[in-house]
């Protein structure tokens, strides 16, 4: 199954919520009032002149499909419900987009753009979905950029994110994909206080044939990063991917830990890290925006990866992230398998999101 097919199939919670919401927005329209029928004026009465009998008006035949359509088993499709795009409908649309975690500011901008040139017109759900998909594509296209690869070796990729965001799995999947593309990769298991994270990376490394450097439990992550840089340089690795801690309970300690990792690896390469990826969990909804703000203060975030889009009805948060921060979205994840993480495509995502 292609990634696009998986995206359409597994983004059902978000697309069903938004698609059903758009149908409801159209369906909420009051039925148009029929214009009042003027009563016919009575015919003048002429004394002594008999009136001819009123001819019977034949009852109109019910609409039926043509002979060819009936022979082929085709029925006439019912007309799609339509609603006049007015202020009340725009308010319903805004409420629906906010409920889908698109955020208030983004929802207001999107609805304003949809209204342009359409106010006062009667539109159906299909046109509304296409208009929304076009707006989402317009917002997302500038940020849909794959992880850049540089001739510099090793290219150091620092990966940050809160615990449970899918950070460790994302590193394993990216490393496996780069390895399959012919790149030589080294992984550093820098979250030295979480044995489970280290073990998970080792499993991914074994699957992909990628070496994973580990250190004793609770040891200095910066020291491990330095050793990993040394090994990556010696082996001519194309990429060094460094996992980091994701404990936000004590931000001061985490900030110092990340800053120390950067200081140490810059002793080996003053331009490192070349990428700092923030991995976000789509199921957190609007909390993802606060995570971006936090990690931009802790580290120089250069791009985003969004995971778990298959397990949430909050896919709209990705639109809010793009609209607010403009950070590149390198990849999205829709499952646990290695090929369930792929480069982000704005148009495919937009159409899957609205159910087209």
Where are these regions (language model features)?
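P-loop/Walker A NTP-binding module and the surrounding RecA-like catalytic core of P-loop NTPases
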Residues: 105-108, 133-356
